Amino acid sequence: MSLLVQLDQKIAANGGLIVSCQPVPDSPLDKPEIVAAMALAAEQAGAVAIRIEGVANLQATRAVVSVPIIGIVKRDLEDSPVRITAYIEDVDALAQAGADIIAIDGTDRPRPVPVETLLARIHHHGLLAMTDCSTPEDGLACQKLGAEIIGTTLSGYTTPETPEEPDLALVKTLSDAGCRVIAEGRYNTPAQAADAMRHGAWAVTVGSAITRLEHICQWYNTAMKKAVL
């Protein structure tokens, strides 16, 4: 049974929650053993997959979870705005560390390695390819190039201003076009995640609202300060 079929079955049975375990950089939680513990807790709570950044974090997580892992490597490049899995060596390292799915930046922006080259390398390892996209054009282009999964991860993050709400319209557009869509980006409440499923999402990735303690505390502090000022 293929991994996609297995995921289809898990999503049908459990609702399609993917948890992104990416602590704030340099946070007290930013340690491989803590990332792995968060991932295991998410799996035990019903997550159908885990999204992990970094090879060391992925290795630690692979040792304790059985659900599929979406692996990425983030880099800040001097000559490109692309940050997510930009190099062949990143793909190779993630594959060796135990990723089941490798996600790359799928936007139409200057990059060191073409999208199609990275997709071919992912498939060379026998893994599923996910592209993190920002527009319908990005997603449809990546689907034509052979990406099995299209994420809305970068919607709102390639423009000067980032909206507060998730991009449900992009989810619906890509789903209607036949893409397997993982809704990702600003899904900070269960209601928003449910809306994404109603708009055709195959699954929904939630990160900050579950695994970034600093962000959650900031949301509460901001709301409570407004209430008393």
UniProtKB/Swiss-Prot annotation:
Biological pathway: Amino-sugar metabolism; N-acetylneuraminate degradation; D-fructose 6-phosphate from N-acetylneuraminate: step 3/5
Pfam name, any one: NanE
Primary enzyme class: isomerase
This protein's UniProt keywords: Carbohydrate metabolism, Isomerase
EC number: 5.1.3.9
Reaction(s) this enzyme catalyzes, per UniProt: an N-acyl-D-glucosamine 6-phosphate = an N-acyl-D-mannosamine 6-phosphate
Annotated GO MF terms: N-acylglucosamine-6-phosphate 2-epimerase activity
Gene3D superfamilies according to UniProt: Aldolase class I
GO (cellular component) term, any one: cytosol
GO biological process, one term: N-acetylmannosamine catabolic process
InterPro entries in the cross-refs: Aldolase_TIM, NanE, RibuloseP-bd_barrel
Family classification: Belongs to the NanE family.
Function per UniProt: Converts N-acetylmannosamine-6-phosphate (ManNAc-6-P) to N-acetylglucosamine-6-phosphate (GlcNAc-6-P).
PANTHER family referenced in this protein's UniProt entry, alphabetically: N-ACETYLMANNOSAMINE-6-PHOSPHATE 2-EPIMERASE-RELATED (PTHR36204:SF1)
Name of the featured protein: Putative N-acetylmannosamine-6-phosphate 2-epimerase
Gene coding for it: nanE
